């Protein structure tokens, strides 16, 4: 499964079975900031995500618009591409979460995520809500701290449709 993850959903947390261990959960957080942002990065980044998916991993990818657009075109071949993003009602809580993450770990990536969402939260949620990705998991107050359960609940509901 390829999981397009909104900043702060818990991608890194899910990939760690316990502190310091990132390789035993079946989940991989494919960090986009490790890729050189040249004209080919989206194809290379998404290609790696697809390759890892084919190997049986659940792969978290960034929610950049060009990543979502690229993966949307692959849904006929890879039907288990899913987006995970918060509901708009969580804006204040979400910004607190991102700020707290930045205060604990002052990386450029965390600072950029916090600053971008502080100014663009509603727009970012709207874009994901209305893009071409079919499967969408919405984070609510009830499932905000259990990403795996939110995704499992989504797929369980789809089985009965």
Show which residues each predicted segment covers:
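Short, charged, surface-exposed secondary-structure boundary motifs
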Residues: 37-39, 90-99, 147-148
């Amino acid at each position: 499964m390829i999981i397009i993850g909104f900043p702060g959903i818990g991608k890194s947390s899910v990939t760690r079975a316990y502190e310091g261990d990132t390789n035993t959960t079946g989940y991989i957080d494919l960090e986009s900031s490790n890729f050189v942002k040249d004209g080919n990065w989206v194809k290379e980044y998404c290609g790696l995500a697809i390759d890892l998916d084919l190997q049986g991993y659940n792969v978290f990818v960034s929610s950049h618009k060009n990543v979502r657009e690229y993966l949307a075109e692959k849904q006929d071949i890879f039907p288990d591409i899913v987006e995970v993003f918060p509901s708009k009602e969580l804006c204040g809580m979400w910004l607190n979460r991102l700020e707290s993450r930045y205060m604990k770990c002052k990386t450029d990536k965390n600072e950029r995520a916090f600053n971008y969402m502080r100014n663009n939260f509603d727009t970012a949620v709207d874009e994901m809500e209305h893009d071409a990705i079919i499967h969408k998991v919405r984070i609510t107050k009830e499932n905000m701290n259990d990403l795996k359960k939110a995704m499992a609940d989504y797929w369980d509901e789809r089985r009965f449709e």
